[in-house]
Amino acid sequence: IARSNPSTPLSAETGGKNAIILTASGDRDHAIMNVVASAFGNAGQKCSACSLLLVERSVYEDKNFREKLKDAATSMKVGSVWNPGNVVGPMITNGNDKLLKALELEQGESWLVPPQFLDKNKYVLAPTVKWGVRPGSYSFRTELFGPMLSVVCIENLQQGIELVNSLDYGLTSGLQSLDEEEQRLWKNSIMAGNLYINRGITGAIVNRQPFGGMKLSAFGGGVKAGGPNYCACFVKISDKPGSTTDYKQSYPKAYEQEFAH
């Protein structure tokens, strides 16, 4: 649209490669719950879904943590959306070339939970976890839009922040840490539009949490959907001398709801 008519006002949210960082001070069980919900809910087909899990080395090397993450992923109910007990349903397409390429291992990678299609047409992919993903690799940098989580080992929070900020996208991001200093550092340093601490990174609520990002996750004015200036780039605002509006008289119900208390 912008190429055919550059003067056309255009604002868009364009995707994400979203990460959660888990430090040694985080509640591991709580973090696993948040990660699998963010990565595999809606079969990973949300622009806000968690695609990367960056784990501090002491946690990354903990066999108990690995087994709990594996168990959480494999315990999710997968199948038809007509079965209300299923949490992970089919993908919108079986021709997602980016995802299919990511289902191949690169150097140093292994499967914590290997890919498994549950139907012959390959629309239903069970939650998949790739272990040992390296910064800069295909799975690290590419938005996959499917139920696959890539786990990366980091030395500390600062390195994790730098790796997340090196991504081309900046939509949602999460931190699992109980350390207030780590939370402060992360909030002041991370480059993403919607930030979440010790909770999942999907599910922004309309009219409560404006949603949008930066870098390749946004195009246009950079304002968030649901925010007060979302449509500002499509209108011209000007003052007319001598023209005022008595909002209390013109919009009595709205005025009362807003200012009565």
Residue positions per predicted region:
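ALDH superfamily catalytic-core signature
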Residues: 1-134, 158, 197, 243-261
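Conserved C-terminal structural/oligomerization subdomain of aldehyde/semialdehyde dehydrogenase
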Residues: 21, 33, 72-78, 117-119, ...
